[in-house]
From Swiss-Prot:
Molecular function per GO: mRNA binding
Protein name (database record): Cleavage and polyadenylation specificity factor subunit 7
Species this protein is from: Rattus norvegicus (Rat)
Free-text comment on this protein's domains from its UniProt entry: Contains an Arg/Ser-rich domain composed of arginine-serine dipeptide repeats within the C-terminal region that is necessary and sufficient for activating mRNA 3'-processing.
Places the protein is found: Nucleus; Cytoplasm
Length: 462
């Protein structure tokens, strides 16, 4: 040691160019701050014929951006963590499954487990960095883990070097369809993403515990994107060319947020594309794959129910997409008032024995509510259902009263004595139901009511 110190003093007095020699030592990870003279062979450090460089007593710089292969060979575990890359497994492999395979070969000192994730959707790329606590564990992983089967795939284990990282990254891009990493490729084109950024131990990366699996929080099939608002839908929505098929979600721009697995795991039974009715909302959220397994998100005003209507007349009605929240509340308030008033008037008329006017009032209220722009909403259906229940009750009461025959004959005589009122009522209904299809539906319902009435009268007389 003393001879090494004398050499340092002599070279320092002669103003030896230590900067150029120190630049060559940047590529070598030193064991400690001070090296002995025996650890300085000139043929290992420099290819030049100059005398061996002196040993600096100041701390050596960290090899941040030098070749990891040389660092891994020289340093051992002193300035670099003991880590390997484990890859070639399926994207749905969990951290627990990987740890179990590692423990099966006798390695129990796993310190950290980092999955390489797709920047766009958080899906696993099929390889991970495994950090262990000892170099012996690294040797075991490199010797015993390759060839182990994990979810039907033989895992590949390599030292944690930048070159191996690039190889695993290239394999991941081949395993994922082009749609899955189209956003990644665009990011790398403008210099914002490189393979090393996806999986490099750095302070900028937020380390997650092994139990956190971001790509498992994304639905791999028709589940909606729970955490995201629905995508903006420009009105009017484009309708599908085939009848009975829901229109595709217009203007969807979140396809890159949805995990498009190249193949589905055996424990997730997912039907083929197109076999799932409108859902997401898979969502929305995060996420339906871009291969059309997810239908349009449910609309507040049942906008998607129009193509499913069995009556062709419903398609010509007003589009609910133009109804704002305030307008919807106003229409619902008016419908509630109509329903309440019609029920009160019908009950009052039925109590007075005027069943004909009560039935006419309820039928008119039902027709008006059905014609409103929010008729397909569940709350409107509740109003219509209550009106129909009241109508059936009044009809049943009128039939029971008419069993004696007097009430029925009185009702017929009343209609014969006042044909003007019947014509006025019919004209009023035609004005309310100016739509031809709704007009037909209304009178079909009236005809069915009269047919039921005639059948009951006939059965009563027999």
């Amino acid at each position: 040691m003393s001879e090494g110190v004398d050499l340092i003093d002599i070279y320092a007095d002669e103003e030896f160019n230590q900067d150029s020699e120190f630049n060559n030592t940047d590529q070598i990870d030193l064991y400690d701050d001070v090296l002995t003279a025996a650890s300085q062979p000139s043929d290992d450090r420099s290819s030049s014929t100059e005398p061996p460089p002196p040993v600096r007593q100041e701390p050596a710089p960290k090899p941040n951006n030098k070749t990891p292969a040389i660092l891994y060979t020289y340093s051992g575990l002193r300035s670099r963590r003991a880590a390997v890359y484990v890859g070639s497994f399926s994207w749905w492999t969990t951290d627990q499954q990987l740890i179990q395979v590692i423990r099966s070969i006798g390695v129990y000192d796993v310190v950290e487990l980092k999955f390489a994730e797709n920047r766009a959707n958080g899906q696993s790329k099929g390889y991970a960095e495994v950090v262990v606590a000892s170099e012996n564990s690294v040797h075991k992983l490199l010797e015993l883990l390759p060839g182990k089967v994990l979810n039907g795939e033989k895992v590949d284990v390599r030292p944690a070097t930048r070159q191996n990282l690039s190889q695993f990254e290239a394999q991941a891009r081949k395993r994922i369809p082009p749609r899955a990493h189209s956003r990644d490729s665009s990011d790398s084109a403008d210099g914002r993403a490189t393979p090393s950024e996806n999986l490099v131990p750095s302070s900028a990366r937020v380390d997650k515990p092994p139990s956190v699996l971001p790509y498992f929080n994304r639905p791999p099939s028709a589940l909606p994107l729970m955490g995201l608002p629905p995508p903006p839908i420009p009105p009017p929505p484009p309708l599908s060319s085939s009848f009975g098929v829901p229109p595709p979600p217009p203007g969807i721009h979140y396809q890159h947020l949805m995990p498009p697995p190249p193949r589905l795991p055996p424990h997730l039974a997912v039907p083929p594309p197109g076999a799932i009715p409108p859902a997401l909302h898979l969502n929305p959220a995060f996420f339906p794959p871009p291969n059309a397994t997810v239908g349009p998100p449910p609309d507040t005003y049942m906008k998607a129910s129009t193509p499913y209507n069995h009556h062709g007349s419903r398609d010509s009605g007003p589009l609910p997409s133009t109804v704002s929240e305030a307008e919807f509340e106003e229409i619902m308030k008016r419908n509630r008032a109509i329903s309440s008033s019609a029920i009160s008037k019908a009950v009052s008329g039925a109590s007075a024995g005027d069943y004909s006017d009560a039935i006419e009032t309820l039928l008119t209220a039902i027709a008006v509510i059905k014609q409103s722009r929010v008729a397909n909403d569940e709350r409107c259906r509740v109003l219509i259902s209550s009106l129909k229940d009241c109508l059936h009750g009044i009809e049943a009461k009128s039939y029971s009263v008419g069993a004696s025959g007097s009430s029925s004959r009185k009702r017929h005589r009343s209609r014969e004595r006042s044909p003007s009122r019947s014509r006025e009522s019919s004209r009023r209904h035609r004005d309310l139901l100016h739509n031809e299809d709704r007009h037909d539906d209304y009178f079909q319902e009236r005809n069915r009511e009269h047919e039921r009435h005639r059948d009951r009268e006939r059965d009563r007389h027999h």
